[in-house]
């Protein structure tokens, strides 16, 4: 039996796992923030793009005592993507070691060939009870106010643990209605994803024209950029907001950046993307 539970995505980490959890930094910090620091085994890729492969992961965590390994694919904020082959290698490796593999696919719809990489299907889950797939529906469909997310696994013991801590009214009427109708627009959504990927490629090229940014390639709906030269990440974020009413994310305080200057820039529509580029060119 496969069970999908609509829960806060970090609940799988917070309430259901008591041992050590492997986390790759930089990351979506709501996950490690739900655990005691002593229970986080942190891996920071030692390269300028914070990229990694399945081999890197196995090499680092191979001699570590883990109950679970968390993979965000594509990652947040780096946009790093593991291929289907690499994910399958980790799936088998974690099974052999008795490690629960938690994969967050919240941004996978934005990746090229993302549908082919996903492990969110019944046969895959049924064959791998140590696998948990998490997806934040609100991120990919652009409805953050609805607070929709799910965890899917064939491990009923784990699902039952999570369900005990879910509020009896964990989905409001707006979210429930959305879940009833969103399937009608699947073709529109798929087309929007294809259009988005094309726009992301265009935005990547235009951002590279900004002399104080080093843009890191991404398979998500954002770019992690290193701010170099005459600005700090804080200064750039502050100027864009105050002078141009444009908000980007200052990542300088995130773990793994070690005081470096990094920002995360969302990929939006052509007009908004061009407005941001023009604003930065005038700085």
Placement of each model-derived feature along the sequence:
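PLP-dependent aminotransferase-like
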Residues: 14-71
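Short beta-strands and strand-loop turn motifs
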Residues: 42-44, 68-75, 101-105, 217-218
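Conserved PLP-binding catalytic core of the aspartate aminotransferase-like
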Residues: 197, 210-244, 267
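PLP-dependent aminotransferase class I/II
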Residues: 130-216
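PLP-dependent enzyme catalytic core of the Aspartate aminotransferase-like
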Residues: 85, 242-243, 256-283
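Active-site pre-lysine segment of PLP-dependent enzymes
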Residues: 54-64, 77-101, 105-140
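Single conserved hydrophobic/aromatic residue that forms the stacking wall/gate
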Residues: 1-8, 12-13
């Amino acid at each position: 039996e496969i069970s999908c539970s609509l829960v806060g995505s970090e609940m799988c980490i917070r309430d259901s796992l008591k041992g050590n959890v492997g986390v790759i930094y930089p990351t979506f910090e709501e996950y490690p923030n739900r655990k005691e620091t002593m229970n986080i085994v942190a891996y920071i890729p030692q390269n300028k793009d914070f990229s990694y492969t399945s081999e890197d992961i196995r090499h680092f965590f191979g001699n570590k005592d883990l109950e679970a390994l968390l993979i965000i694919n594509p990652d947040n904020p780096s946009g790093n993507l593991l291929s289907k082959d690499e994910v399958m290698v980790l799936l088998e490796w974690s099974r052999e070691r008795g490690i629960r593999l938690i994969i967050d696919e919240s941004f996978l719809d934005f990746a090229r060939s993302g549908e082919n990489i996903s492990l969110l299907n019944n046969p895959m889950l049924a064959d791998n009870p140590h696998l948990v797939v998490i997806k934040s529906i609100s991120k990919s469909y652009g409805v953050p106010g609805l607070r929709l997310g799910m965890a899917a696994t064939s491990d009923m013991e784990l699902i039952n643990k999570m369900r005990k801590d879910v509020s009896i009214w964990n989905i409001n009427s707006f979210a429930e209605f959305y879940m009833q109708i969103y399937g009608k627009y699947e073709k529109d959504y798929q087309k929007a994803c294809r259009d988005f990927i094309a726009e992301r490629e265009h935005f990547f090229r235009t951002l590279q024209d900004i002399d104080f940014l080093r843009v890191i390639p991404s398979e998500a709906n954002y770019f992690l950029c290193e701010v170099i030269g005459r600005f700090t990440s804080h200064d750039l974020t502050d100027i864009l907001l105050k002078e141009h009413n444009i908000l980007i994310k200052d990542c300088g305080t995130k773990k793994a950046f070690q005081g470096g200057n990094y920002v995360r820039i969302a990929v939006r529509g052509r007009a908004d993307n061009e407005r941001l580029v023009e604003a930065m060119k005038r700085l």
